[in-house]
Amino acid sequence: MNVKQIRENMTEAALSVESVMRGHPRITLQELSTACSISLPAVEFIIEQMLCMRVAQRGAFGRYTLTPEYQNGSF
């Protein structure tokens, strides 16, 4: 799947998480939950899906960021 196809299939909640992650690299799950007004379990589920699809990556200190490939659209 390319970036356009992935974004077309995202829920509103996932698009919200992705949007916040674009503006705040290296963000925690709790910070995402607060910024998006989405429950922590829902954010965890969305992030796990993003990790499986290689849209996001987990840093050493439990912070998450979008992968450079996804950000650049060269997925």
For each feature predicted by the language model, list its residue ranges.
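Short, cationic-aromatic polyanion-contact patches
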Residues: V3-A14, T28, V55-F75
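Short amphipathic alpha-helical interaction segments
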Residues: I38-Q49
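Alpha-helix C-caps/helix-loop-beta hinges
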Residues: H24, Q49-M53
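Short amphipathic alpha-helical interface segments
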Residues: R7-A35, F45
